Amino acid sequence: MSATIIGKVKSGGRKDYDVKWDSSSKEVYVSWGGWTGVGKASSAADAMRRAEAWLYNK
């Protein structure tokens, strides 16, 4: 299965970025400079939290 866009998160600079999550590999991607891998998440909600935390200082 491929990664699916599950929502948008705001960076510390208040810009919106799409978040993708691959439910089979658990990989999380953010649309920052292309699709950037930001780690693994156990659920879609966890993926959104991880993406938001990763983007906070961007």
What are these language model-derived features?
Residues M1-E27:
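Short N-terminal "domain-start" leader segments
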Residues D22, G33-T36, L55:
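Short linear interaction motif-like sites in intrinsically disordered regions of transcription factors
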Residues G39, A53-K58:
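Short arginine-rich
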Residues G13, V19, S43-A45, N57:
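Residues at secondary-structure transition points
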Residues W32-D46:
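A short, exposed loop/beta-hairpin motif centered on an aromatic-Gly-Thr core
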